[in-house]
């Protein structure tokens, strides 16, 4: 469940497979990440392979914004009524929303997966790209971080939308919570050679992680 929750807060999505008029609503879960995160895709696949019929597939596509040919990896689960129930909580009118009861399901592991999906590291702060959520939903996320993890976040403008930032002091708290749950290939999300805290957090392991990632 942590993989589903963390991914749905991030880049993952549920695709509704039936409207539920004469039968239960069904949905399937789709994972799609770029080539740099190939290992992360396969890690998610291993966590969910009892729901999946095919291994992750490679796809090549043209990115008009960057005028480049991109490579990415994806897989999806089989459709099920159980995922249809989760769809009901995470979607409204076909759009992803922040469930009212998200505080019951967020924990350090699902938070780490959310960060692996949407987190970034500037060397002096962390941000979570929460652009898909409304401003009111992001205010609820700020409250969630404060009440459940004791972390103070800030909503910052990012062009026409908003995201959540964690400045000096707070990002250290966040790193301590999520680092035990990060997979090795995603440690670059918190390890930065310009950031002395990385070495304190990961000790002698930090140089190895930087080489591996």
Feature map (PLM): residue ranges:
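Internal intein/HINT superfamily modules and their associated LAGLIDADG
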Residues: 1-213
